[in-house]
């Protein structure tokens, strides 16, 4: 079985013995040919009689016999004569090295390393062999094993200088069970402190009393069962005695003690890691100095190097191992460690790939391509300071004087500016110097370690600890054939760090990354950089699989648009230079992902315009600290950052020059997610976003129309209570002059799909303007509701309502173009369609009986136009007519519970809970809200009002509070999906105060127990009265009335106004209704407040039945206990014992040694 794991060497690469043979073979003359023959050999079965000194060493080779028993065929079939005999000699030398040279600690560590290389079947077989071998000594070690695994205190074992204490600790560790954590913890506390050991070594070394402890008698005879004879150990680690005050045996016992403890499975992982660190400190303290190596006799040089490698851990990187191996004479039993084989790989060639300036400072970064002797190629990036310090500290024997002077002069030139340098090109000089570097420089250990290590600057910059050293194995015969491909891969693997500056006036380079099929070399780092989530979000918005545009095209377009903006706005030349510097860093990569630009949006009749999407949360290459540094502040894209702060803060209304410039469209919302949208309108280009917040804009004559404000998309880590900003939507216009209508955001993810074949597919709510007038734009809700965590919530909703302004220009057509498509509705009734659907048509004022009343909005002075809701708006008392539905647009707003098929291009619509928050028209239509009505509940009646808009259209900052006439004190202050502020008009067009449609004073809902008995609406949502990490879940069934005794002795309110009720934030992220904490108190029922309807379903818990008798909640029979299965109670109230405590797993796989045989007849019978 081991044959399948064997590499081209004689045994496994992790085994030190064969690897150590190679340096010795290289040192001997004429050993190259046997080395080649050993590459393909397989170890034959061990010889019957091997010359071993002490009796215990044969047991480990016997354990190794079964795996290597099938090797003769491989050994016999080796190329060259004498292959089988050479393999036998190799194996015999391995046995001699293991039994005679290694000490106990080194043998145990070596055997554990071999066991890690075995497969499970081999381990089972070796376990059987070990059981058989250990059974013979079981009756001798039985008492000690009981003491080691028992609960009794082993006694005082604190003084590690006593040989009896060390011997007893070694025996206890050897006999400790692998699952006895309690005894392992006790032994861990009894282990000597490594600091005390090191202090003792220093003290005895200072006194000069060496070998004082060596001749002390062993306190326990059982020590010999765990250790070999003192002769091999003393001779094997003779070097340790030269460096410390403890004797040979004491040093070996301490090493054995810490080695066994660091490898024992009974200790926890943390304990083993700590013990491994202590072992390394002890080994470094006991290791011999280089000057002592020259004084030692030459016949001990081989064993000294072997013990140095064996005492050193395989993970450790010993710098002196290679130097010691070079001094080994050919006559010693030299076996190199595995570490020496790794260090034997040297550098063959160093090429300077490129020099780039780091940020705007004066230092540079150097990217090197390093070819190693094992045919691997690495790309290393070093800073100017690191390279200069490395060359200054380089020993003189590894480099020539002319080389140092020339390269240091070039590096000193690199710290200067380009105009101050003597040599104009630094890169060719350094490239020539490194390519012609001497062999002594390339093969030195410090050069290898420098080009293997990770740059400290890279460790500082990348939070994911991604190494700037990436190795790609390239076969030698593929180097010449695929030189171009390999150079491209190396370019891909280069690191260039783009540092983003989050200051307001500083230029930034925030490049949005469009999803593209990346190659395997780049996608292996995707999970560490958060690109997986970005791909899932970005690729969901792509309707057609098209190739991504390069980032150079995007920024060249940005430069052209910026240059035109500079001509118009008179920007200084410094801003243009900043743009050029931005362009120089386009083809760079961040953390292994190449930056590319989003899609272009091509129009069929107008010029092409770039769809520039600003960087959002998942900008490629961002680290987690950058993403969460300022979550509630809007991101600035590259172009906005180049503008001055005064230009960004100015008030941009519909008459501003930005509305006239459709080619400078940019989607720079409130931390919006960078997505790529493929938009192909048939007749007119839809450009997405401008600098001042215009999101949707018709490309032909969009500047003639005012805008509809709506809530932009928020960053997904927006703090609770963050203020809402405004981004404006212009009302698009069809080819024949008819206004398409308004786009009303809902609280769910809204996707824009095409209703008819002539309509254009829109990626982000882009209305396609076609040549026909009978077109509908249908907005369906995605079945996935948008969590309320991603939406802004005001800290005091009753006082900080945001009233949006709706500015619509009347269409140029007559009122005949809007035929009445819906019959008039009777008073208090509901119209056609689902009760979850609201149609918001846009139509001409000629369809309304009421005459317009002038308002105070000074922006536009055109004819009035009304946006009304004729669905879900009960017309109450004296409404003379209903609002007709026009034929040119239909906006469907289903609630979150409406299941709609998700179109291929879905976009989480940036909406707050205000579904129809764009309320008053710009000139004559306003919110007909009485003092007790809900202004943000978004009701628009066919009549007119003189209430001005409370918020200006293009306020750049947070919206102020509305007028006092529009505030109210109910819990439904933030209601979004349904309309309750409906006014009535008489024939003269004056306002009649509407009947109160507020909630029931007892239950907070519109039920028959309050004053509004004629309105029975069972399936609707409540507002969100508070900020918090709540998730909105759809309501799956209607809400029963819970007015009887549901509140804490709350009196009935006849006026319909309910007291404001604010609950603390729920600690449950899933938003499920949990069992109330106060459920055991009297007169307490599940409180159903109106504000929680948007957070989670507000039906009462099935186990809580409200009553008026004051006896508390009652459990009904619908509840069952999962512990005992009986209905009527929960598992926490169950009287039966927990089933988890009774059902214990009976499957245990362990190695339990059998009882000691009464006599020796069993062995003979077997």
From Swiss-Prot:
Classification via Gene3D superfamilies: Phox-like domain, Zinc finger, CCHC-type
Compositionally biased spans, kind Basic and acidic residues: 572-587, 634-653
Zinc fingers, CCHC-type class: 1119-1136
Gene Ontology molecular function terms on file: nucleic acid binding; phosphatidylinositol binding; zinc ion binding
Name of protein: Zinc finger CCHC domain-containing protein 2
Coiled coil feature spans: none
Species, as recorded: Mus musculus (Mouse)
InterPro entries membership: PX_dom_sf, ZCCHC2, Znf_CCHC, Znf_CCHC_sf
PROSITE patterns: ZF_CCHC
Biased amino acid composition, Acidic residues: 214-223
Keywords: Metal-binding, Zinc, Zinc-finger
Segments for region (Disordered): 1-85, 205-240, 550-668, 904-982
Keyword rRNA-binding assigned: no
A cellular-component GO term for this protein: cytoplasm
Record field: compositional bias (Low complexity): 65-76, 624-633
Biased composition (Polar residues): 919-947, 964-982
